[in-house]
């Protein structure tokens, strides 16, 4: 593999997934010996104020703006024509030009849909091999452009959707979504149980409550579940200090059953020992769950890519989708008591995972970029 190539990775922080994939690909580049690798949060660098406002609105869509986001997501996908979205087409254009002039990349990798990047080829005539690494288990047309040289997708389902709208099958490679390598490492569980004060003889429910819009009334749900002495609950509150504080009294009265945690760096450890997890259907979290075979319960997915992700996993028999708060307790209780269902969901989850995605993607990108560059040189020689 030619590690002398200069790589520019472009991303955006609308949710953590796109940035995390960019970071994983960056780490893979460095581990393979690439010296010239740059990651750019393009929209943030291009217009910080607009970026902050739109990120705020994006987060609010999980609570008060669901219908607006639904109309935007499905409406744009239905009528999408890049020429009609002239403002979006130009977003980040100046900063992109600066980055290209500064770094002169041989390869551009995109982990967030950015029309401005493939449009740069039309605008300047400069051919820089450009690749989309898609971060969900569904397709939105805003990812698609004739100047994207190859798409890297999670599943055959996403590939088929791309082919149906005119993408050549050879321009799509099913690789899975890049995740942090610790999720694919072999780690003994015994030390993890001890570290978090959990028993290996009782069921463990993991609630990822720190993410936006996952679950309300977490305390009430925990109170009800704690009536079963055979259930252990781990609530990851992330940066939600108020939630962690609200669970402190309950944690003190049930120290062996309830663990309320803040931000957890080695979250893969908890994935390894949990029997099922309540979370939101983000593409990265779901991919991490496939790596370790964690059955998931998805509560009221937000319309858009998360709802489409949820439908895919539900149809595949790897997730349970709950749309009413009053159904959560019964669904969780029934699942934890159903060994056959848990095992089936676990195996279905594992069957969706493709190992070493970042390595596969990087190797293929370098190979494809060589072909594109050689073809470009050949065409120039003929002219």
UniProtKB/Swiss-Prot annotation:
Pathway: Glycolipid metabolism; diglucosyl-diacylglycerol biosynthesis. The keyword Glycosyltransferase applies. One of its GO terms (molecular function) is 1,2-diacylglycerol 3-glucosyltransferase activity. GO terms for cellular component: plasma membrane. It comes from the Bacteria. Gene3D superfamilies: Glycogen Phosphorylase B. Transmembrane segments: none annotated. PANTHER family: MONOGALACTOSYLDIACYLGLYCEROL SYNTHASE, MONOGALACTOSYLDIACYLGLYCEROL SYNTHASE 1, CHLOROPLASTIC. Belongs to the glycosyltransferase 28 family. UgtP subfamily. This is Processive diacylglycerol beta-glucosyltransferase. It comes from Bacillus pumilus (strain SAFR-032). The lineage of its organism: Bacteria, Bacillati, Bacillota, Bacilli, Bacillales.
């Amino acid at each position: 593999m030619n590690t002398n190539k200069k790589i520019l990775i472009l991303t955006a922080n609308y949710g953590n997934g796109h940035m995390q994939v960019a970071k994983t690909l960056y780490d893979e580049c460095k581990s393979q010996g690439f010296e010239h690798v740059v990651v750019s949060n393009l929209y943030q660098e291009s217009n910080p104020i607009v970026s902050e406002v739109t990120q705020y609105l994006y987060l609010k869509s999980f609570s008060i703006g669901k219908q607006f986001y639904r109309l935007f997501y499905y409406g744009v996908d239905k009528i999408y024509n890049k020429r009609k979205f002239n403002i979006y087409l130009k977003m980040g254009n100046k900063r992109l030009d600066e980055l290209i002039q500064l770094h002169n990349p041989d390869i551009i990798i995109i982990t967030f849909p950015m029309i401005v990047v493939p449009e740069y080829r039309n605008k300047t005539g400069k051919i820089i091999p450009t690749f989309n690494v898609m971060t969900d288990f569904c397709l939105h047309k805003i990812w698609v452009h004739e100047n994207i040289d190859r798409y890297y997708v999670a599943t055959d389902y996403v590939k088929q959707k791309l082919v149906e709208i005119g993408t050549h099958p050879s321009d799509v490679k099913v690789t899975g979504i890049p995740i942090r390598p610790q999720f694919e490492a072999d780690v003994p569980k015994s030390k993890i149980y001890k570290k978090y004060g959990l028993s290996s003889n009782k069921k463990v429910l993991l609630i990822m409550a720190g993410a936006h819009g996952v679950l309300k009334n977490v305390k009430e749900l925990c109170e009800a579940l704690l009536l079963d002495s055979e259930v252990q609950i781990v609530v990851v509150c992330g940066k939600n200090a108020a939630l962690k504080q609200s669970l402190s009294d309950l944690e003190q009265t049930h120290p062996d059953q309830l663990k309320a945690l803040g931000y957890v760096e080695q979250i893969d450890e908890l994935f390894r020992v949990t029997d099922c997890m309540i979370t939101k259907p983000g593409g990265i979290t779901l991919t991490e769950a496939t790596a370790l075979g964690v059955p998931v319960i998805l509560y009221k997915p937000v319309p858009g890519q998360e709802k489409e992700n949820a439908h895919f996993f539900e149809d595949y028999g790897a997730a349970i989708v709950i749309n009413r708060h009053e159904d959560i307790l019964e669904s969780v209780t029934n699942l934890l008591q159903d060994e056959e269902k848990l095992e089936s969901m676990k195996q279905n989850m594992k069957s969706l995972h493709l190992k070493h995605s970042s390595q596969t993607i990087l190797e293929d990108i370098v190979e494809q970029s060589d072909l594109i560059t050689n073809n470009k040189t050949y065409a120039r020689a003929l002219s």
